Amino acid sequence: MGGDTISIRSQSVIDAVPRIHLNRIERAVTRATTAMLEMQDPAGYWWAELESNVTITAEYIMLHRFLGLDESKVPRMMADILDKQLPNGGWSIWRGDGGEISTTVEAYLALKMAGLPAEDPRLLKAREFVLARGGALKTRVFTRIFLALFGQVSWDGIPLLPVEFMLLPPWSGLSIYEFSSWTRATVVPLMIIMAKRPVRPLPPEQGIPELFLSSDEPVFQHRVAWKGEASLLENLFVILDRILKLYAWMRLPWPRNFALRQAEKWILEHQEDSGDWAGIQLSLIHI
């Protein structure tokens, strides 16, 4: 690839970084460069295992359950998740983070689907981890979408991304082409899911009500909340979400059905030769 090379001791770098740190930075760059060169294959390329956090495995277990697929490999996936649990009961999203709530909730749900009882000591520690951080409603939107798919929270509380966005032209500034390519491959099928709101109920013993601070939370407090002390700009997304949900409540059939057909067409036209979309698991799960 082309481009200019900037010395770590160029004037622009010296001005931006305290001088006392330059030697440390230079040594770190040298070590990193040496390590990369040692890993290079004689043919000129690099190859290494692509690692991820346990959400990939947990979501794969959820996919098998939602679609009613063969679950014979689930025990092995369950063992892999348990092997990566931290001493504090949580699961990491990156090494050394001390555990992350969304990752932990997804792992917990997948383990219960796999048959681990709520009284298992490992799940008890995970429950303590989640409740100490505010409960399952403190998770990211993607995690709450998985919870909604299995009836653990209401779809009404999920921030809405209407499938009608498929109809917006690129010049509008709000079309799907404002997203990166891999995000589009995830968002387009996700908009179909949000329009259809499917739910595959779980047996009571596999649900996760114990991860909420209150039994009313999944229904009554699970929504995009207005922040009383925040500025109007900070609450703009709350306002937009409520407007979009009002529009969705009106259930206008023509634009909705046309947008669904356009989304389906987009998905079929953008499938890779390898059979996937954008080379990531999340887009495949949503599709």
What are these regions (language model features)?
Residues 1-286:
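Preference for long, amphipathic alpha-helical scaffolds in soluble/luminal domains
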